[in-house]
Amino acid sequence: MANRANRHAARTEDSDNTINYVQCDGLAVMKMVKHCHEESSNMDLAQGALLGLVVDKCLEITNCFPFPKSGDETMDEEMYQLTVMRRLRRVNVDHLHVGWYQSSDVGNSLSMALLESQYHYQTSIEESVVVVYDTQKSSRGFLCLKAYRLTPQAIQMYKDGDFTPEAFRTLKVGYENLFAEIPIVIKNSPLTNIMMSELNELLPEDKGHNFLDLGTATVLENQMRSLIERVDELYQEAVRYNKYQQVVFKQDTEKHRALAKLAAENAVRTSKGEPTVPEDEVIKQFRPMTAPNRLTATITSGQINTHAQHIAQFCSQSLAKLFITESLQIAKEAKEAK
């Protein structure tokens, strides 16, 4: 606890250097992957707790367990987590809570719920991270496991509860710096590496006939559908913000017109020796408009950026497969012609 207090005192507001990288045990990764894929079959969001410890600037994740899934509102999830960690402590297993994990569908991990949950975790447990596992991308052969932490600017903005455009400009917060990605490393014990080497020798050699498979239209279709939905949401947010700006502009115009009229009337009163009317009487008639919440639009912009990156990456891979397949087909036809 003393080490945590010292690290907290040394941290600056401008940069978050609490954690440099995350080291995850292979068994913990397998537990997360198994849980996320089981819940993805039911189209549910998988979430769980991460256990481990902090060594210098490295967050070591050595174990994890899923959050309870129950429709009973009387169930105390916090008590459940404390009970699990208490029992792990009895069997001499790392029981310190260092974060949480959740599954992701087609890369759509950034959300209001994720931001709020990580804020509460990071303000109560300084070193905590959120690990996001993309089930669909991993099922295609690309292990997608990423660790994130809220940036100091995002924490300050959420702590102030001010999500107006002025607050975003002052803190220089955008969708690209709400979260900071922390490098994650998977580590196995020497015995595990030996066993995996032996299993690798027992596995049959892959012929590689699926490497050039182009029948992945459903992946692109899901990404495009999600992208269209997010663009539509961002358009609605833009319409609301434009209406707010129009109302503010109209109010400012009327306010300046009223102040100009009052100034002319006060000039007449001054020439007649009568007392002038203070400008506060006019200003009180125009109450300041409440600025709309821009956090939703920022998160939606981040989701659009993520989908666009995934689509670009997927299309580049598909084009590469297409050109390679074309070259192989031409070579095959030339060989058969001989």
Swiss-Prot record:
Query: Per the record's keyword annotation, is Ligase included, yes or no?
Result: no
Work out whether the entry's keyword set contains Cytoplasm: yes
PROSITE patterns per record:
MPN (PS50249)
The record's SMART domains line, in alphabetical order, gives: JAB_MPN (SM00232)
GO MF annotation list: metallopeptidase activity; translation initiation factor activity
Compartment(s) of residence: Cytoplasm
Domain of life here?
Answer: Eukaryota
Listed under GO biological process in this entry are: formation of cytoplasmic translation initiation complex; positive regulation of Notch signaling pathway
The primary location reported for this protein is cytoplasm
Q: What Gene Ontology cellular-component terms does the record carry?
A: eukaryotic 43S preinitiation complex; eukaryotic 48S preinitiation complex; eukaryotic translation initiation factor 3 complex
Query: Which CDD domains would you find in this protein's record?
Result: MPN_eIF3h
Task: Cite the MPN domain residue spans from the record.
Answer: 22-154
What Gene3D superfamilies does the entry give? Cytidine Deaminase, domain 2
Write the record's keywords in alphabetical order, separated by commas: Cytoplasm, Initiation factor, Protein biosynthesis
InterPro entries, per database record: eIF3h, eIF3h_C, JAMM/MPN+_dom, JAMM_MPN+_peptidase_M67A, MPN
Belongs to which family? Belongs to the eIF-3 subunit H family.
Q: What does this protein do?
A: Component of the eukaryotic translation initiation factor 3 (eIF-3) complex, which is involved in protein synthesis of a specialized repertoire of mRNAs and, together with other initiation factors, stimulates binding of mRNA and methionyl-tRNAi to the 40S ribosome. The eIF-3 complex specifically targets and initiates translation of a subset of mRNAs involved in cell proliferation.
Q: How the protein assembles, per its UniProt entry?
A: Component of the eukaryotic translation initiation factor 3 (eIF-3) complex. The eIF-3 complex interacts with pix. Interacts with mxt.
Instruction: Give the PANTHER family listed for this entry.
Output: EUKARYOTIC TRANSLATION INITIATION FACTOR 3 -RELATED
Q: Output this protein's name.
A: Eukaryotic translation initiation factor 3 subunit H
Q: Name the species this protein comes from.
A: Drosophila sechellia (Fruit fly)
Gene designation per UniProt: eIF-3p40
